[in-house]
């Protein structure tokens, strides 16, 4: 894969907002309804009215055998230059979730499956010398304190084929967090 261009963060992420925020949901009931036929929406931008908190829950410390097998597959980004299966990354022993409300006050708690929160945790655990509590507090500081006070958050929600087809009451998880800086009121005039 070759990047053809880059969308910068100038002017409060204006170009990124134009690219990512053309059809933003604010109502979970409407989004879930649109996930069914005929629209079959499986990826959406969602702006919560309020993010209540970041939930950190303990998870398995080792990969399940079926996940481990998938992780060891050849890397599709090496253009055939790989010498064999890739080494699996270390499993993060925690699940990170946001609890938020939509425009009608409907509360949802969804897993954050974004690679960025995993990379943040790995960097924090390394800087904390392996201290998981310190690493979690640093993740919480970024995703709860900094993001919720200084950023204009939009969540990218996606479904898995399994959850989409089985018609879960809510088939979505958070697959990305879009966090441009919150604009001051002066910037609007």
Description of each model-found segment:
Residues 4-189:
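Nucleic-acid-binding small beta-barrel platforms of the OB/S1 family
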């Amino acid at each position: 894969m070759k990047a053809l261009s880059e969308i910068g963060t100038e002017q409060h992420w204006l170009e990124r907002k134009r690219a990512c925020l053309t059809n933003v949901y604010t109502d979970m009931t409407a989004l879930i309804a649109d996930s069914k036929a005929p629209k079959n929406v499986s990826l959406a931008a969602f702006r919560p009215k309020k993010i209540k908190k970041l939930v950190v829950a303990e998870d398995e410390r080792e990969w399940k055998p079926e996940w481990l097998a998938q992780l060891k597959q050849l890397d599709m980004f090496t253009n055939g230059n790989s010498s064999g299966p890739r080494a699996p990354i270390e499993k993060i022993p925690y699940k990170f979730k946001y609890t938020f409300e939509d425009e009608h006050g409907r509360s949802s708690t969804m897993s954050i499956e974004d690679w960025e929160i995993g990379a943040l945790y790995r960097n924090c655990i390394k800087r904390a010398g392996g201290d998981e509590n310190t690493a979690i507090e640093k993740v919480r500081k970024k995703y709860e304190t900094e993001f919720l006070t200084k950023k204009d958050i939009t969540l990218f929600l996606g479904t898995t084929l399994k959850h989409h087809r089985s018609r879960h009451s809510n088939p979505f998880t958070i697959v990305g967090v879009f966090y441009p800086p919150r604009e001051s009121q002066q910037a609007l005039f």
